[in-house]
A protein has these predicted regions:
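N-terminal anchoring/stem segment of glycosyltransferases
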Residues: 1-63
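C-terminal catalytic/acceptor-binding lobe
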Residues: 3-21, 25, 125-223
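Short loop/turn segments at strand-loop or loop-helix junctions that form parts
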Residues: 5-12, 41, 69, 89-92, ...
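Structural alpha-beta junctions
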Residues: 27-37, 84-87, 140-147
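Generic structural signal for helix capping and beta-alpha/helix-loop junctions
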Residues: 46, 96, 155-156
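A short acidic (Asp/Glu
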Residues: 48-51, 75-78, 158
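Short beta-strand-to-loop acidic/aromatic patch adjacent to the donor-nucleotide binding site
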Residues: 61-74
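Conserved catalytic core of nucleotide-sugar-dependent glycosyltransferases
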Residues: 71-138
């Protein structure tokens, strides 16, 4: 039986870029002799826990792999599998060759998932930013994490609103849920400026002061 890689198969796709990207991902998985384990999804956001549980159920070995839907596999992640660690993979941007600080693919041993990760999963939207904060920090807390470069490429495109904008509800939901998990487990918190809904007005006097100071400094330099 072939080793399986799970990712969301989104249909209908919200845009042509993603439609092409997920097809290229599927082809890259098959080119490495692996089997795509598709998680059927629509254009709406999906909870990360649902995707990972699907990946675990679909596992044909002692490990499972999950990745984002718009990367391209260039090497077989199962080649470095070991039962003692979760492995995270940073993407390389194409065509720039820049390495991304975030993690877009994970190889997870079934035993670590069953006995540890699955027992306390924060309620994160996949695609809503910072899911890698949990999947990286949770195994790191028990000394069971290692990161790698050189396994996945990512054709560059403009950032999505859900991934970076602090006013985006999916972004803010993920930050809240991650921080709740982090407090329970003694991990580092994500800090973002507090903003009023809709109008985006800052609720933090410290943030206001720092923003004012930066504007003042830029103004002084321009004189």
């Amino acid at each position: 039986m072939k080793l399986r890689v799970t990712f969301q198969w989104i249909e209908p796709c919200p845009n042509e870029r993603l439609r092409v990207a997920q097809q290229r991902l599927l082809e890259s998985i098959e080119a490495l002799g692996l089997e795509p384990a598709l998680f059927p999804a629509g254009p709406e956001m999906t909870k990360l826990a649902e995707i990972l549980r699907h990946a675990r159920r679909s596992s044909s070995s002692d490990y499972f792999v999950w990745c984002n839907s718009d990367v391209i596999l260039t090497r077989n992640p199962f080649a470095i599998a070991d039962r003692a660690k979760v492995h995270g993979f940073h993407r390389r941007e194409v065509p720039s060759g820049e390495l991304c600080g975030g993690v877009d693919m994970y190889l997870i041993p079934n035993v670590i998932w069953d006995n540890y990760l699955s027992r306390d999963i924060p309620d994160l939207w996949c695609g809503g930013s910072h899911v890698d904060w949990w999947l990286t920090r949770a195994p790191a807390l028990i000394g069971a994490y290692e990161s790698h470069n050189g396994f996945i490429d990512h054709p560059s495109h403009p950032e999505s609103g859900a991934s970076k904008r602090t006013s985006n509800p999916y972004f803010r939901h993920n930050v809240r849920e991650y921080n709740a998990w982090a407090r329970r487990n003694g991990a580092g918190l994500l800090e973002v400026p507090a903003r009023l809904p809709l109008i985006g007005a800052s609720m933090s006097p410290i943030t206001d002061y720092l923003s004012w100071a930066r504007r003042r400094l830029r103004g002084d330099r321009g004189q």
